[in-house]
Each structure stands twice: as structure tokens, then as C-alpha cells.
Amino acid sequence: MLERLNGLLMQAGIVITDTQKTQLVQLVELLHKWNKAYNLTSVRDPDAMLVKHILDSLVVSQHLHGERFIDVGTGPGLPGLPLAIINPDKQFVLLDSLGKRINFIRQVILELGLTNVTPVKSRVEEYQPEVGFDGVLSRAFASLEDMLSWCHHLPSAQGSFLALKGQFPEQELAQLPANIHLVASHQLVVPELEGERHLLEFKHIQPEQGRSFI
């Protein structure tokens, strides 16, 4: 599997350490093992997991700006775990409401020795962080409107929402509230993955402060 991963990384132009490659392979092996009992993903084949879960997560890495990130509706830790593995200098909170998913993430953290991942079992609207995040990641939400509504309290004043989508969602964008600004749209290239992938970056438009009229 390591040789297969090396080939995919080369196609994607992603350079990581040998230790990180080994950890990514371990992640796939654990996901494949746990999936048989806990049904964590509909992708059953480890080779397909490398493409649809690992590479599909890693291509987001170059667009992560800042130090603190939260992956909302992380499922079995996607994209949070692969991103944490190749970004040991960044901190990741992985949020999900299902205990079996959080238990899996805890096991991965233990077996891979990850020190930059914090799993949290909670519904997103009930999770209240003490400090806002530089980036709020999600590939779980069906609609942008839901993501931006339920996660509105999570980014810092300068933080961004980072939504992983398939096709460019023009119709959804037209329905977004006026206080949300699309900062950037990145078309992602995932080797051997059929269909389009986009990463959309949003920010809150901050109200003007300190203006008074007499």
C-alpha cells in the first residue's frame, strides 16, 4: 500500500516525510479494520480509501492558513486526520456527534502517536470553543447554507470557513446571506478521482466599528 500511496502523492505533487507516509498507511489499515464492525464509511476497499479519503483530504493542505482548525462533522476523521498527520505544526479539533466515530479517532491518535488532534463528541451548535478557529473545515454538510448557519460561531474574527464540495455550487452561492463573502474558490485535482472537487473559502463580513453620527 505504501508504494501505491507514493505513486498517488507523486501525481498530486505532494511531498511529505516517510514517517507521515507510514502514518497515512496505518490510518487506512485502521479504517479498513474498524469499518467492518462499525460501518464508518461506505468505501470498503483500502485502495479506494487512499484516493477517496486520503488524497481527497491532503489536497486541501496548501490552502490551510493559520494554526488552529476544526473539522466539523468529521466522521471517521476526514479530512482532519490526514491533514493533521502532514501538518504537525497545526492544531486540529475533530468534531462529531457519534460516539463510534470519536472512539475510532481516539484509537488512531493513540496508535499513530498524534499530539495535535483533539476529538470532541458534540453537536456543532452545542460546541462553544473558548477561542475561535483560523479555519472551519467541512466536507459533511449537504448545503453551504447549513454549514455557515450552524458553524457561524466557530471562526475567529479573521478566520475562514473552508467547504469541500463536488461541482461548483452556483445556485447555493446565490442564496447565501449578505454577511458572508466568498473569498476564494479552488478547483482541486485529486489523482484518479472521478468528478469535480472544489474548496470554497468564506469569511464573515465584519460590521464597520466605531462610526457614530451626531
Curated annotation (Swiss-Prot):
The keyword S-adenosyl-L-methionine applies. InterPro entries: rRNA_ssu_MeTfrase_G, SAM-dependent_MTases_sf. Its EC number is 2.1.1.170. It is found in: Cytoplasm. GO terms for cellular component: cytosol. The keyword Methyltransferase applies. Its main location: cytoplasm. GO terms for molecular function: rRNA (guanine-N7-)-methyltransferase activity. It catalyses: guanosine(527) in 16S rRNA + S-adenosyl-L-methionine = N(7)-methylguanosine(527) in 16S rRNA + S-adenosyl-L-homocysteine. Keywords: Cytoplasm, Methyltransferase, rRNA processing, S-adenosyl-L-methionine, Transferase. Gene3D superfamilies: Vaccinia Virus protein VP39. S-adenosyl-L-methionine binds at residues 73, 78, 124-125, 139. Belongs to the methyltransferase superfamily. RNA methyltransferase RsmG family. PANTHER family: S-ADENOSYL-L-METHIONINE-DEPENDENT METHYLTRANSFERASES SUPERFAMILY PROTEIN. Specifically methylates the N7 position of guanine in position 527 of 16S rRNA. This is Ribosomal RNA small subunit methyltransferase G. It comes from Aeromonas hydrophila subsp. hydrophila (strain ATCC 7966 / DSM 30187 / BCRC 13018 / CCUG 14551 / JCM 1027 / KCTC 2358 / NCIMB 9240 / NCTC 8049).
